[in-house]
């Protein structure tokens, strides 16, 4: 969902509203958030944080990187992935979105929710919403992709859900080698395990990934985790 103004402008409006109507600041923030299409101010802040994090992560990505964005449902990982694709295309790179979760209409709606018409990038965005998405199909589809192409895969845990597909670890290693060989950037969106407790840790980390099947998490050169507006960006040492 596109904001009508930068977050600091919206917060300024909330402060003015609080003074003018003599209401608590948190109530004013919630009113502004509602006007922007959010249920309360924490969701508005989370949306703004995701937008900023997308630009920061994109600026850090290099050809050959294999990155991961992890969050619980509703905390912005898919929108962040879409925003990174838009950043890549605006920078003149090709982009690709492979999803086992959404239909083409769903993806179009995701782009529209951040104020972007997907048709604007016709010819620059490769989209695959089929059930056949796997490391093998991705590599075949991108065999001629130029260096700098940015790829988002939605999402990690679904890659080997169908039993006829190779093990998750094998697929991720294959995509890692492909990324390095071709100079493309591969980003996985990932679920967080239900055991994650935000009361003891404000933002999940690599230890909180939901991994029904084994995977060496050291494979990721960069990671980003999101939770209620908190963002943690890290590069492998």
Q: Which ranges hold each PLM region?
A:
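The Walker A/P-loop phosphate-binding site
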Residues: 32-35, 39-117
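Aromatic/hydrophobic pocket-lining residues that form π-stacking "cages" and hydrophobic walls in ligand
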Residues: 14, 84, 175
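Short gly/ser/thr-rich secondary-structure transition/capping motifs
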Residues: 48-52, 132-136, 205-207
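Hydrophobic/aromatic beta-strand patches that form the interior of the parallel beta-sheet core
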Residues: 67, 96-98, 128, 187, ...
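Phosphate-binding/switch region of NTP-binding enzymes
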Residues: 176-237
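Short, small/acidic-rich helices and loops at N termini and domain boundaries
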Residues: 2-44
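Short, well-ordered alpha-helix to beta-strand connector turns
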Residues: 64, 92, 148, 219-222
């Amino acid at each position: 969902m596109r904001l009508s103004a930068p977050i600091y402008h919206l917060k300024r409006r909330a402060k003015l509203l609080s003074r003018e109507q003599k209401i608590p600041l948190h109530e004013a923030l919630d009113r502004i958030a509602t006007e922007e299409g959010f249920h309360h101010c924490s969701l508005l802040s989370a949306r703004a944080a995701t937008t900023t994090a997308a630009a920061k992560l994109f600026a850090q990505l290099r050809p050959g990187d294999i990155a991961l964005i992890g969050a619980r449902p509703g905390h912005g990982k898919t929108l962040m992935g879409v925003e990174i694709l838009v950043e890549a295309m605006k920078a003149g790179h090709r982009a690709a979105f492979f999803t086992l979760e959404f239909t083409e209409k769903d993806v179009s709606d995701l782009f529209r929710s951040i104020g972007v018409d997907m048709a604007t990038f016709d010819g620059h965005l490769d989209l695959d919403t089929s059930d056949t998405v796997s490391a093998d199909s991705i590599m075949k589809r991108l065999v001629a992709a130029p260096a700098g192409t940015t790829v988002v895969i939605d999402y990690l845990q679904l890659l080997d859900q169908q039993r006829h597909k190779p093990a998750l670890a094998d697929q991720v290693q294959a995509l890692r080698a492909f990324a390095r060989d071709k100079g493309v950037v591969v980003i996985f969106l990932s679920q967080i395990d239900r055991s994650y407790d935000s009361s003891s840790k404000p933002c999940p980390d690599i230890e909180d990934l939901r991994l029904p099947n084994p995977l060496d998490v050291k494979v990721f050169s960069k990671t980003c985790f999101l939770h209620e507006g908190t963002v943690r960006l890290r590069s492998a040492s």
